[in-house]
Structures are given as structure tokens and as C-alpha cells.
């Protein structure tokens, strides 16, 4: 089955690579229209997936990721339309010039070819990834989690209908609908057909891909994100940022999971934090120093376990640790962070600059929420993933991250001396 999918995707990629920006945008507009026109089919399939997942004991955080509503589906369709408005990087001349030999040389952006994406209970990823791949002239093979099997099948069927109506092969966007995990290992060895693989899931999936894949892998998406409250932070303003970073949508990878509080501000900051977190329904997991103060406040508080500093809660839970200074905060982030998104709240711009320079994450913020790490917020459109590695792409992966380049030399029967 996968062999045939690979062949179809590779053949489709050749046709996609030749499309003009106008032709690609026409396809995307058709997909957006069909997602809305056939929304009832997708929502009914999703309702079945959610019901099965709940019956199987899936946690609330994952159920939130899985669930579609009419508003969410419309938002997904609107995101596709936003991709139409983005500049097409394919064909862009990055640099070039004329060599001493007279050869005119240029470096031009081109599609990667076929992208493989493995992800869990995130039905929006199906459309986000497909739209970005089509915009950049890439075919894509999707492998969603078993929890989204019906939703993904319905969504991809709608996308393929739109492709066919535009004269393009269905092989441009395909989904593996068999939940057999053995197919993941088989997919990881499809280097004959797949040019880049993006896993969007937990640490176990990332480890499997690194160990077994014969395809270049872009890893990321695991977000143990930190906010450091410096001693000069404005408490009221800092709390607004923390509430946003923790509670706006707790199930996302850019949600803060650990709060590091400078010891010199702890006495005044922690009581205010407790009050705010109680109102927001957040459970605090505090170290010994913070626990003594937080236990007298209104927020629910428990003693933090050492391993929780490495946890991506994806829920209304927040670690709180008192640190001695900026050095202590940076050391903690280096030990427990996932190089996703980390922030400092401070009025001391020297400390802010040190934090930016010394915290080696894909996104680092000064006096801002970690929730900004998102393709849409960055002006990149829908994102295919958030890369936490350093090669090829880093941070939210927009259109350029789905391209490579080729060198093109144009001569007049020019030969090398």
C-alpha cells in the first residue's frame, strides 16, 4: 500500500512543481470552499472520533486537540485562504551573479518534492500541512493518529475532490488510514519517495524517527516552555502575560509549563500569583521554597516532583520554582528546556539581552507570552510544525521551510578553463 502511495506522491510532485502561483492559489481557494461546503461530513466524522476517544479514556487535553467545531473548521478554511495571500517562495532567486568565466549563476528556490508528516490527534494539521505543501509545490503523505482516523479520511477526501476538480492528481495529498503502527516504521524507510519527514508528537515518536528513519527528519513540537520573572518585573503586567501563556489554550506546545521566579521578588509576587491562578483554575506544582508561601494562598498547590520539570503538562498545571538569579534561571532552562519557547519578564534590558543571547531556544521573548510561537502569529501563515532543531529550519515552519534550492548556471556554450 505505502509503495503505491509513494509512487503516486512522487508523480504528483513533478506536476505540482510546474504550477504557477496563480494555479496553486486557485487550488487552495477551491479547498477552502469545499471544506465549508462539506463541513457537515467532516464534523460528523469528527464527532465519532471524539466519542470513541472519550470512551477509550483519552485525556481532556488530547480531546481538546482532537475536537472540531463549526467555528474551528471555518477558521481552518480561512487559514487556507490566508495561505493564498502569502508570497510564493518557489522560483525566488536567493542570490547570484556573473562569474569570471562569463557563466551567469543563480541560486533559486524549488520545492522539496514529497513531504511525510506523522502527527497525533490534531485534525487541523491535516489541512494546515496540505495547504502549505501545495503552495510550495510539494506532494504530501500524512499519517495521523488513530484517534483522528475518520476525521482525516473525510478531510483528505474533500481535499482530493478539490484537487481533481482543478485537474490535479489525488496523489498530491494522501493519508495513511490504516492505524497499524508497523506502517510508521515502513514509512520511515521510504527514502525512495519521501524527501523530508516531520514527526509531530511525543518524545517516543521523535526517538523512533531518529533511530529508524532513512529520510531526513525535522523534529520539534515538544514544548516545555519557561517564563523567568526577573526581580525588576512589573508584577501586575507579568501576571497578565503568565495567564495568557498558561490558560489561553493549555493543550498547545507553546503554553508555559514552568515559571521561574527570582528570589528577590518572590515575597511580593507569589501571593499575587496564587490569587490569579486560583481565579484561572491552575494547579501549581511548587518547589520547597515556593511551597511554603503558596500554601497560604487560594490556589491549589502541590509539591513538585523532580521529573515534572521535564513534563509537557498540556493542561492547567504549572511548575513554580524560586531561583537565585538570572544565571540560575538560564541553567534550569538549559537542563530542562526543549529549545521551543522561553521568555523573560523584566525592566532590566541588560538582563533581557543576556537572556536572549544565552537561552538557546527556537523562540526567545522579552516581556511577551510564549503563545506567540505560531506560524500565523509570525506572519508565516499556517505552520507545518515548530522545529526545535538547528539544521534546515528552526521555529515555526512556514513556506520557505518547505523549499530547498538549486544552482542554475546559464552560459553561452561556456566551458571551464
From Swiss-Prot:
Keywords, comma-separated and alphabetical: Amino-acid biosynthesis, Cytoplasm, NADP, Oxidoreductase, Proline biosynthesis
Reactions this protein catalyses: L-glutamate 5-semialdehyde + phosphate + NADP(+) = L-glutamyl 5-phosphate + NADPH + H(+)
Similarity annotation: Belongs to the gamma-glutamyl phosphate reductase family.
InterPro entries hit by this protein: Ald_DH/histidinol_DH (IPR016161), Ald_DH_C (IPR016163), Ald_DH_N (IPR016162), Aldehyde_DH_dom (IPR015590), G-glutamylP_reductase_CS (IPR020593), Glu-5-SA_DH (IPR012134), GPR_dom (IPR000965)
Pathway: Amino-acid biosynthesis; L-proline biosynthesis; L-glutamate 5-semialdehyde from L-glutamate: step 2/2
Subcellular location: Cytoplasm
EC number from the UniProt entry: 1.2.1.41
GO molecular function: glutamate-5-semialdehyde dehydrogenase activity; NADP binding
Purpose: Catalyzes the NADPH-dependent reduction of L-glutamate 5-phosphate into L-glutamate 5-semialdehyde and phosphate. The product spontaneously undergoes cyclization to form 1-pyrroline-5-carboxylate.
Domain of life: Bacteria
Keyword Cell wall biogenesis/degradation: no
Principal localisation: cytoplasm
GO terms, biological process: L-proline biosynthetic process
UniProt cross-references to Gene3D superfamilies, sorted A to Z: Aldehyde Dehydrogenase, Chain A, domain 1 (3.40.605.10), Aldehyde Dehydrogenase, Chain A, domain 2 (3.40.309.10)
Name of the protein this chain belongs to: Gamma-glutamyl phosphate reductase
